[in-house]
Amino acid sequence: MKISKYILICSIILLLAGCNFGDSTEQKLSTILSEIYDLEADYRDVQEELADTESKEQANFQQMMELTKDQKEELTTMVEDTATLLKTRLALVEKEAASIKSTSESIKQISSLVSETKEASEKESLKEIETSLNERIKAYEEVTTNYNELANMQQELYKMLVDESADVTTIQEQVKEVNLHNELVQQSVQKFNDATIRVNEVKEEVLTSLQKDAK
Protein backbone atom coordinates (compact mmCIF):
# COMPACT_ATOMS: atom_id res chain seq x y z
CA MET A 1 0.00 0.00 0.00
CA LYS A 2 1.45 3.36 -1.02
CA ILE A 3 0.68 7.00 -0.55
CA SER A 4 1.52 9.55 -3.20
CA LYS A 5 4.23 12.07 -2.49
CA TYR A 6 2.70 15.30 -1.32
CA ILE A 7 5.82 17.49 -1.34
CA LEU A 8 4.79 21.09 -1.81
CA ILE A 9 7.13 22.61 -4.36
CA CYS A 10 6.81 26.34 -4.91
CA SER A 11 10.15 26.78 -6.59
CA ILE A 12 9.16 29.78 -8.67
CA ILE A 13 10.03 32.94 -6.80
CA LEU A 14 9.11 36.53 -7.40
CA LEU A 15 12.23 38.19 -8.77
CA LEU A 16 11.57 41.86 -8.26
CA ALA A 17 14.77 43.36 -6.93
CA GLY A 18 17.25 45.44 -8.87
CA CYS A 19 14.87 47.59 -10.91
CA ASN A 20 16.00 51.21 -10.87
CA PHE A 21 15.05 53.54 -13.69
CA GLY A 22 15.08 57.09 -12.31
CA ASP A 23 11.99 58.88 -11.02
CA SER A 24 8.27 59.00 -11.97
CA THR A 25 5.94 56.05 -12.49
CA GLU A 26 8.49 53.35 -13.25
CA GLN A 27 10.61 54.28 -10.23
CA LYS A 28 7.58 54.25 -7.92
CA LEU A 29 6.48 50.89 -9.28
CA SER A 30 9.99 49.51 -8.96
CA THR A 31 10.03 50.56 -5.30
CA ILE A 32 6.69 48.85 -4.63
CA LEU A 33 7.78 45.64 -6.36
CA SER A 34 11.03 45.60 -4.41
CA GLU A 35 9.02 45.96 -1.18
CA ILE A 36 6.94 42.94 -2.18
CA TYR A 37 10.08 40.94 -2.89
CA ASP A 38 11.50 41.82 0.54
CA LEU A 39 8.24 40.98 2.31
CA GLU A 40 8.36 37.49 0.79
CA ALA A 41 11.73 36.71 2.38
CA ASP A 42 10.15 34.29 4.89
CA TYR A 43 8.33 32.54 2.05
CA ARG A 44 11.61 31.90 0.26
CA ASP A 45 13.50 31.03 3.44
CA VAL A 46 11.21 28.16 4.51
CA GLN A 47 11.20 26.29 1.19
CA GLU A 48 14.23 24.08 1.83
CA GLU A 49 13.20 23.15 5.38
CA LEU A 50 9.63 22.53 4.26
CA ALA A 51 10.71 20.17 1.48
CA ASP A 52 13.08 18.36 3.87
CA THR A 53 10.35 17.94 6.50
CA GLU A 54 7.87 16.64 3.94
CA SER A 55 10.45 14.17 2.62
CA LYS A 56 11.15 12.82 6.11
CA GLU A 57 7.45 12.47 6.82
CA GLN A 58 6.93 10.61 3.55
CA ALA A 59 9.79 8.21 4.37
CA ASN A 60 8.33 7.59 7.84
CA PHE A 61 4.95 6.82 6.38
CA GLN A 62 6.35 4.25 3.99
CA GLN A 63 8.13 2.55 6.90
CA MET A 64 4.98 2.58 9.01
CA MET A 65 3.00 0.89 6.27
CA GLU A 66 5.48 -1.99 6.35
CA LEU A 67 4.90 -2.56 10.06
CA THR A 68 2.04 -4.59 11.51
CA LYS A 69 -0.13 -3.78 14.50
CA ASP A 70 1.69 -6.56 16.32
CA GLN A 71 4.69 -4.21 16.30
CA LYS A 72 2.63 -1.74 18.28
CA GLU A 73 5.42 -0.12 20.29
CA GLU A 74 7.57 0.61 17.25
CA LEU A 75 4.54 1.71 15.24
CA THR A 76 3.33 4.05 17.98
CA THR A 77 6.75 5.70 18.23
CA MET A 78 6.89 6.23 14.48
CA VAL A 79 3.37 7.64 14.38
CA GLU A 80 4.25 10.11 17.12
CA ASP A 81 7.44 11.15 15.30
CA THR A 82 5.57 11.53 12.03
CA ALA A 83 2.81 13.57 13.66
CA THR A 84 5.50 15.90 15.01
CA LEU A 85 6.91 16.33 11.51
CA LEU A 86 3.44 17.14 10.25
CA LYS A 87 3.02 19.78 12.94
CA THR A 88 6.41 21.24 12.01
CA ARG A 89 5.58 21.57 8.33
CA LEU A 90 2.20 23.16 9.10
CA ALA A 91 4.03 25.78 11.17
CA LEU A 92 6.33 26.40 8.20
CA VAL A 93 3.37 26.73 5.85
CA GLU A 94 1.77 29.18 8.27
CA LYS A 95 4.95 31.27 8.21
CA GLU A 96 5.04 31.03 4.43
CA ALA A 97 1.39 32.11 4.19
CA ALA A 98 1.92 35.08 6.50
CA SER A 99 4.77 36.22 4.27
CA ILE A 100 2.63 36.08 1.12
CA LYS A 101 -0.32 37.76 2.86
CA SER A 102 1.88 40.61 4.10
CA THR A 103 2.32 41.83 0.52
CA SER A 104 -1.34 42.86 0.23
CA GLU A 105 -0.79 46.41 1.49
CA SER A 106 2.09 46.95 -0.91
CA ILE A 107 -0.06 45.73 -3.79
CA LYS A 108 -2.70 48.30 -2.81
CA GLN A 109 -0.08 50.99 -3.38
CA ILE A 110 -0.20 50.12 -7.07
CA SER A 111 -3.88 51.06 -7.07
CA SER A 112 -2.95 54.45 -5.63
CA LEU A 113 -0.29 54.78 -8.29
CA VAL A 114 -2.95 54.14 -10.95
CA SER A 115 -4.95 57.07 -9.58
CA GLU A 116 -1.89 59.33 -9.64
CA THR A 117 -0.91 58.42 -13.19
CA LYS A 118 -2.30 60.57 -16.02
CA GLU A 119 -1.24 58.51 -19.03
CA ALA A 120 -3.94 56.03 -20.09
CA SER A 121 -1.41 53.46 -21.31
CA GLU A 122 0.46 53.61 -18.00
CA LYS A 123 -2.79 53.16 -16.08
CA GLU A 124 -3.59 50.02 -18.05
CA SER A 125 -0.09 48.64 -17.50
CA LEU A 126 -0.28 49.26 -13.76
CA LYS A 127 -3.73 47.66 -13.55
CA GLU A 128 -2.39 44.61 -15.37
CA ILE A 129 0.43 44.06 -12.90
CA GLU A 130 -1.89 44.72 -9.94
CA THR A 131 -4.32 42.13 -11.28
CA SER A 132 -1.58 39.54 -11.80
CA LEU A 133 -0.29 40.05 -8.25
CA ASN A 134 -3.78 39.71 -6.76
CA GLU A 135 -4.45 36.58 -8.81
CA ARG A 136 -1.21 35.11 -7.49
CA ILE A 137 -2.30 35.71 -3.89
CA LYS A 138 -5.68 34.15 -4.64
CA ALA A 139 -3.94 31.12 -6.13
CA TYR A 140 -1.75 30.80 -3.04
CA GLU A 141 -4.81 30.93 -0.76
CA GLU A 142 -6.17 27.97 -2.70
CA VAL A 143 -2.88 26.13 -2.12
CA THR A 144 -3.00 26.65 1.65
CA THR A 145 -6.68 25.67 1.90
CA ASN A 146 -6.11 22.40 0.04
CA TYR A 147 -2.79 21.77 1.78
CA ASN A 148 -4.27 22.15 5.27
CA GLU A 149 -7.20 19.92 4.36
CA LEU A 150 -4.71 17.30 3.17
CA ALA A 151 -2.76 17.58 6.43
CA ASN A 152 -5.95 16.95 8.43
CA MET A 153 -6.64 13.84 6.38
CA GLN A 154 -3.09 12.65 6.95
CA GLN A 155 -3.44 13.18 10.69
CA GLU A 156 -6.51 10.95 10.66
CA LEU A 157 -4.61 8.33 8.69
CA TYR A 158 -1.76 8.29 11.20
CA LYS A 159 -4.24 7.79 14.05
CA MET A 160 -5.80 4.86 12.22
CA LEU A 161 -2.47 3.07 12.04
CA VAL A 162 -2.41 2.66 15.83
CA ASP A 163 -6.16 2.30 16.27
CA GLU A 164 -6.90 -1.37 16.91
CA SER A 165 -10.48 -0.92 15.74
CA ALA A 166 -9.38 0.33 12.30
CA ASP A 167 -9.25 -2.54 9.82
CA VAL A 168 -7.13 -2.77 6.68
CA THR A 169 -10.01 -1.79 4.40
CA THR A 170 -10.67 1.40 6.36
CA ILE A 171 -6.99 2.34 6.26
CA GLN A 172 -6.82 1.62 2.52
CA GLU A 173 -9.83 3.87 1.92
CA GLN A 174 -8.20 6.68 3.89
CA VAL A 175 -4.98 6.28 1.90
CA LYS A 176 -7.05 6.53 -1.28
CA GLU A 177 -8.72 9.73 -0.06
CA VAL A 178 -5.36 11.22 0.90
CA ASN A 179 -3.93 10.45 -2.52
CA LEU A 180 -6.92 11.97 -4.30
CA HIS A 181 -6.68 15.14 -2.26
CA ASN A 182 -2.95 15.24 -2.86
CA GLU A 183 -3.67 15.50 -6.58
CA LEU A 184 -5.82 18.54 -5.82
CA VAL A 185 -2.94 20.08 -3.85
CA GLN A 186 -0.54 19.49 -6.73
CA GLN A 187 -2.96 21.13 -9.15
CA SER A 188 -3.27 24.21 -6.94
CA VAL A 189 0.52 24.38 -6.52
CA GLN A 190 0.89 24.34 -10.31
CA LYS A 191 -1.72 27.08 -10.59
CA PHE A 192 0.23 29.19 -8.08
CA ASN A 193 3.51 28.62 -9.89
CA ASP A 194 1.88 29.57 -13.19
CA ALA A 195 0.51 32.73 -11.56
CA THR A 196 4.00 33.60 -10.32
CA ILE A 197 5.46 33.11 -13.79
CA ARG A 198 2.75 35.39 -15.12
CA VAL A 199 3.61 38.07 -12.54
CA ASN A 200 7.25 37.99 -13.57
CA GLU A 201 6.34 38.21 -17.25
CA VAL A 202 3.97 41.13 -16.72
CA LYS A 203 6.48 42.86 -14.45
CA GLU A 204 9.16 42.72 -17.14
CA GLU A 205 6.76 43.89 -19.84
CA VAL A 206 5.39 46.79 -17.80
CA LEU A 207 8.72 48.09 -16.53
CA THR A 208 10.24 47.88 -20.01
CA SER A 209 7.27 49.75 -21.45
CA LEU A 210 7.40 52.44 -18.76
CA GLN A 211 11.12 52.84 -19.25
CA LYS A 212 10.64 53.39 -23.00
CA ASP A 213 7.85 55.91 -22.39
CA ALA A 214 10.09 57.86 -20.03
CA LYS A 215 12.74 58.38 -22.72
Residue ranges of each PLM-predicted region?
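N-terminal hydrophobic targeting signals that begin at the initiator methionine
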Residues: 1-2, 20
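Primarily heptad-repeat coiled-coil rod domains in cytosolic scaffolding/tethering proteins
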Residues: 24-27, 31-34, 70, 77-84, ...
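Sec-dependent signal peptide recognition
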Residues: 2-10
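Extended amphipathic alpha-helical interaction segments
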Residues: 96-178, 185, 197-209
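C-terminal motif of bacterial Sec signal peptides marking the signal peptidase cleavage site
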Residues: 15-18
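Immediate post-signal-peptide N-terminus of mature secreted/exported proteins
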Residues: 21-94
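Short, solvent-exposed mixed-charge patches
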Residues: 213-215
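Amphipathic alpha-helical coiled-coil segments
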Residues: 36-50, 89-96, 100, 140-143, ...
